[in-house]
Every structure is written in C-alpha cells, then in structure tokens.
Amino acid sequence: MKKTIAIALSLAFMFNVNTLPGNTCAFGSNPYWTYTLHPDFPMDKYAAGQLGILKNTYARSYLMAAYRYLNNKPLTTDEQKGFEQLWDQRLQATSSDCAGNTESWIKLRATVPGVSKIETIDTERPVSKENSYESYCNAQTSAFETAAKTLKSMIEKYGIGSAQVKEWVAAQDEVFSNCGSPRYSDKVPEAKIPKPLPESADATCKQERAYQIAAANFYAQNFDTARRDFEAIAADANSKWKEMAGYLATRSMIRQATLAKETNKNLLEQAGQKIQHLIANPSYATLKEDLQSLANFIAVRISPDAHLNKLATEKFDQQTIEEITKTLDNYLDPDNSATEVTYSKVPENLKKNEMIDWILTFQATDEASTKHALARWKETKSTAWLVAAITGVDAEDQHANQLIAAARADKSPYAKWTLFYHIIRLESGQSKDASVKASLDKVLSAPPAELPAGALNSLKLMRLPLSANLDEFLKYGIQKPLAICSDGGVPEMPDEEDDLKGKGKTPPTFTTLAGNVLTNKFPLSVLRQVATNKQVPANLRNNVAWTSWVRAVLVGDEAEAKNLAAIASPLNKAKSKFFTSYLAATTPEDRKFAAALLMLHFSSAEPNAASGQLMDDDYGDSSGWWWGASPVRKITTSNSDDDSDSSSDDEPFDPLFLTSAQRAQATTQLAKLAKVETAPNYFAKIVLAYAQKHPADPRVPEALHYAIKCTRYGATDDATTKLSKQMFVTLHSKYKGNVWTKQTPYWY
C-alpha cells in the first residue's frame, strides 16, 4: 500500500501523465553503441563507482551518484541499492501507473452474478473545462487494488450473490465512472454520486457507502464536498476507513489547489499544516511515508529552495534521490517541456547547494556554466569541478592546456575515463594527432576491465578518423552495439532483456559515422575492398557488396558493377539467380534491364552502405524502399550523440589513407549519383524502353508488375503517376491473361 500510494502521488498531479522522461521519437529500432541518457546496463557497476565517461545529457539521478564519487565519497551499499531501485523503477516503466490494474478489477467484478458487463474503465480526466487538452491520472492502480480487496471482504461476509454485494458493486461502478470523461471537449461530465444508505442498513455497508460517496466526489472534482465527507469519516472512530479518509481529505485539498488555473498556495499551506498534525498522530503511523510524500509535494511548490537544501543533506535512499530529482525537474521545467539547462537562468538560491550547483553547471551548455565551472575549479581544485570545467571548454579555449595538465595529474579512479576522454577530445581539436593516437592505442590495445563497453566504443570512435589504412578503419568503424532500442516507450531502453544484463548478442555493425564515410567518401574501388575483406563479418560484406553494386549500376561503372555482382552473389542466395542473369547479359541494354529487375525485387536496393541493422531484403515495413530524389544520403540515428564524439552531427571525415586519385573518383561518382532520378521513375523508364524493344521477353510482364508496385511504395514525384499509368496500360494491353497482369489491378 505504501509503495503504490507514493508512486500514485508522484504521478497524480502531472497533468499529462503519459509524458515520459526524455525525448521519445517515432517507433523504429536503432543500434546504440553508447547511451546518452543513462550509463551502461547493468547499472550496479555504475552505482558502485564505475562511471565510465560521464555525459552532461545523463538524467540528474545519475549525476547525483557521480558527484559523490568525484568527491571521493563513495556511496554506501544501502545508498547504491537506493539508486539502483530508483533507476530500475524509472526505466522499467513503459507507461504511467494510470489504469495499470483495471483488468484485474474488471475480471473480479465479473464474478458477481447479475452485474452488467463492462470492458474498460477510463481513468484519465481533463484538468478542467477550460483546459481540456491536458489530462491527469484520476484513478491509479492502488484505487483498483483497494476496490478488489474490499469486494473480496464483502463477498466473504455477505456471500457473492447477496444484495449487499450487488449494491456495493453498483455504487462502485458509479464511483469509477467519474474518473474519466470525453477528451478534447469542453463538456463537463455529469457526476454520478452513490446515494446514502438508509439508517436501517447494516453498519458495515453504511461505512462502505460513505467512503464510496466521498471517493466519487473526489474523482468528480467536487473537492470541497469530498474533503468534508472524508473528514466526517476520519472523525468516525468505528470506521475502518478513518485513517485513509484523513489522508484523502488532505489530498482533496492538494488536488483542488494544483488543478486550479493558478496554484492556490494558501490552500497548499493549509494542507501542509494538516499533514504535519497527521504525521504526529500515532494512529497514522502506517501512512507516515505517504503523508511525508504529500508534505514533500507541497514543499516543492511552497519553498523549493529550502526543501532541496534539506534533502541534499540527507542520506541517499530511493525516496530522497527521487524527491531531489523530481523537485529539480519541477522547479526548472514546470511545464515538462524538457528544455536544456541554461545556467544563467538558474535561480540563485539553487546555486547555494554545492551538489545541486555542480549538477546544473555540468548539465548546462551556455557560456555562463563554463565560466562558473572554471571559477569553482580554480577555487576548489576538486575533481568534480575539474570534470565540469573540462567538459565545457573547447580546444581553442585559453584554459584548455591548463585543464589538460590538471586532468593528467588527477588521481581519481572515478574520473579517470571522463578526464581521459576530454584530454583526447581537446588534443584532437588542437591537431595533436600523434599524441592522441598513442594515448588511444595504449588503451585500445588492451582495454581495462573497468572500462564500460559504451566508453570503449566512444574511444574507438575517436580513433576512427586517425586510421592509417583500411584495416584500421574497419577495426574501429565496426562496433558491437550495446543494444537495439525501439524507443517506443522509455528512450534508450533495450528491446532484449539480455541487454539489460550486459549479455546482449547483437552482432557488430558499422557505426553511424563509419557508415557515413563509406557512403560519402569511399570510391567504388575501395568499397569493393571492404566487401572482400575477411576482417568484416559476412553480413556486413553482403551489405557493402549489395549497396555498392547498386551504386555502380546507377553511375554507369559496368566494370565495377560486374566485379561487385560476382562478390555479392554468393553472399546472398536469394539474389543469386538474378545476379547470374545480370552477369550473363551480353549487351549494356540487357544488363541494365537485368539490374533493374533485380533491384525491383528487393526494395533494400539503395546506393548507400548502411550502418546499424541491415535493411530487409524484400518488401516490408523496415525495408529501405530504394532511393529518393537525393540518392546520396547522410545517415542519422536517434543516438546521433554517439558519433558527435569525433565529428559534429555525424559529418563524414576524409580518410587519411585515401589517395588523391581515389578522392577524385569518389567525388565524380557522387556527382553522377546525385543526378539519378528517384527510384520509381528510374525503373519505369528502363522497363518501358525495354518492353518496347523486346516485347517477347518473358521477363517483361514481371518487370512491369514490380515497377508499378514500386510507384506505390517508393519515393515519388510529379512525373511518377504518368509513368505508372503508362506501364499499367502496356501490361494490360499487351499481356492480357498473364499471371503478372492479373496481380496488377491498379496503377498509382
């Protein structure tokens, strides 16, 4: 009960309870080589001090733990558990607690004979008539658990088919009917309040009904009435609900105060005074933690500065950690817009506490935060402020070399990899390539056991631009992702449970940055070398051979196209017969048609080597759908921060090992590729021209079918529909009764 009430409270006053922390994006599986919002899984190692490379994009609870270690005050075992419990709770939540247990309640309710059938219960209600577009969770899991527990006790006392049980269920239906209402409407729902039972009714039934009436008014936003009713129940010494009613009377005041257009601080202060009286009352001992949570909730809104300073001096248990981060979030981002921290706008009172000041300085990205971090480091010479300062400066900063020297001299085992990373970052910006390469190679040649996998991937990525040859590029450009994350609920949450244990089996892939270099810097001759390099896993060689062959065809390099076809064919049996036909073609016209037919069969055909997971090789929701009006593309991912480690915004770099001739080849090939039409139009023109010259070729109807299909699924423009219709007319006029004609009822 204590846990569920506390969790319910933390969510009940968030107007849009479906908003999750962080920046969610459209569903889609992406590889993560490092995380940007949290440390590596499992997080017990981070809680124990293996901080890896700290990022200022981490949630504040992770930075709270880091602050302690950076000040050489390791977390106790109990404190570590408190952090781990909070992180697990937050990351496992794929949605709010709202309506989390309605199904169990509905199922139990259905066992009562003669009750009407219900399918769902709406538990979210608009804030007000004027603010119908924002909603809050009106009834949480604990409400349905309490109802289920009460129903079971009623059945045990009166019998499942008794009038008392049926009347109680009917009244409870009215209670829960007030929880939701029509969305995006200014219509105020009509409250359904159970009627009081007659004086002659059973005493237990009357107590239950009194509680139901108060709860119904609470859910219906009749807060004055609900408070009065709950206070009356609290005064009834014989009611089993007296303590819970006293608690809910204060919640009625809080909800009334916070759902108002402007928060009613006077009413909150009154509620706070009542809560303190209840906390001091021994009868409320079982609800003490929940009452304290209410007191904290009020303190955040009445005197957040004092509340934060008090919390920051307490022992770090789960509740304290959560309360600090929640208070900071509400203070700095009251409308839940998730904007970046701007230190110059942080209230001065927040800066008085050293830990909070450090966290906000480290997270902020403005000039004021960097100046403050430098000033505090010069004053304290502490590791924590050194980390904040070196994170904020760039290579041209006048303090860069001083910070690099201090970072080299720092002996903190907890800051080691963060400081190492920023030394490399700053020296890379100063073009000290030899020093950077030597430092990285020393670590990467024998990675220490305490170096987290995500941090190791970041260091490999920094080494990538310094590759002296193709083998080095492949060594550092192919990495094992920490996980594949769909980002459909909690951001950066692995899809597979094994990844949460650090035992994921996701195969190595090209990183985003490496994929961009392959696509935008390598000529076909070097891409062919990648496709035949045994250092590269077979699935990645298949990827490169396939996409590079597509590119060779599109730019008209028949020699490379033939070479790549011979390489790609044995790597993918599904394409082998098409490649055989392509290689057997005796004229350029025939080869072009055979190539088009092959690409039409596999919508993953595009002229860009992919990073991350491979595209599907057939039609499907995750296929590449060929190419669009701009065939050359730069890859971006939801985890783009990974590749900003060594190159801003995933921008591809010029590999050191490419010759001037190879660079020129790549430039020429990319220029030709940029002129290629969008795929549906490209295929349509080839197929129509071939059909006109070779109408008897048995492959023509099949090609027309797939080319028309491409005009439905591919990237189209104003010319596509005319071409689609032209192919449709050709197919239906010249190949009547053909199996492919029958499968093509429309043009697009």
Report each predicted region and the residues it spans.
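Gram-negative bacterial Sec-dependent N-terminal signal peptides
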Residues: K2-L20
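Extracytoplasmic/secretory-pathway proteins
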Residues: P21-E231, A237, W241-L248, M253-Y748
